[in-house]
Amino acid sequence: MKTFVLHIFIFALVAFASASRDSAKKIGSQYDNYETCLTEHGLTDDDIFSIGEVSSGQHKTNHEDTELHKNGCVLQCMLEKDGLMSGADYDEEKMREDYIKETGTEPGDQRIEALNACMQETKDMEDKCDKSLLLVACVLAAEAVLADSNEGA
């Protein structure tokens, strides 16, 4: 019995460490064009917000508007290089397809509905950088809420 409890404790610790590690990652750092877009915008990895900071909304209160805008420009650059945006316009279908492929979601998954809602919420924004950051922040926040609600279920 002690061994079983120890295994559960270790599993929970590993799961927590994995989630913490992901939240410390920089937004977009897992994508091919990350370094290219940082260079194009004259930024370093230190200038980019962490996933945890964005998913919790802390990026809005902890940073100046210029930092928010610059982070959004890096995100927009990556989205454009991946064919998901052109200027300030989304390719909604391609964005859904890539999201499904990346997350392994199935039709009807709440995360797809969240992506759709986030695209709808930001679609009329004219500034491509602010629009990109708001979209990514919206999706990350929705994923965090859904993950929390699934843990409680």
From Swiss-Prot:
Pfam family name, one: PBP_GOBP
Instruction: State a GO cellular component annotated for this protein.
Output: extracellular space
Subunit structure comment from the entry: Homodimer.
Which InterPro entries does the entry link to?
PBP/GOBP, PBP_GOBP_sf, Pheromone-bd_protein_Gp-9
Q: Where in the cell is it found?
A: Secreted
SUPFAM superfamilies (alphabetical): Insect pheromone/odorant-binding proteins (SSF47565)
Record GO biological process: response to pheromone; social behavior
Alphabetized GO MF terms? pheromone binding
Q: What does this protein do?
A: Colony queen number, a major feature of social organization, is associated with worker genotype for Gp-9. Colonies are headed by either a single reproductive queen (monogyne form) or multiple queens (polygyne form). Differences in worker Gp-9 genotypes between social forms may cause differences in workers' abilities to recognize queens and regulate their numbers.
- Species whose genome carries this gene: Solenopsis interrupta (Fire ant)
- Which cysteine pairs are covalently linked by disulfides here? C37-C77, C73-C129, C118-C138
Which protein are we looking at? Pheromone-binding protein Gp-9
Gene3D superfamilies linked: Pheromone/general odorant binding protein domain (1.10.238.20)
What protein family is recorded? Belongs to the PBP/GOBP family.
Q: What is its main location?
A: secreted
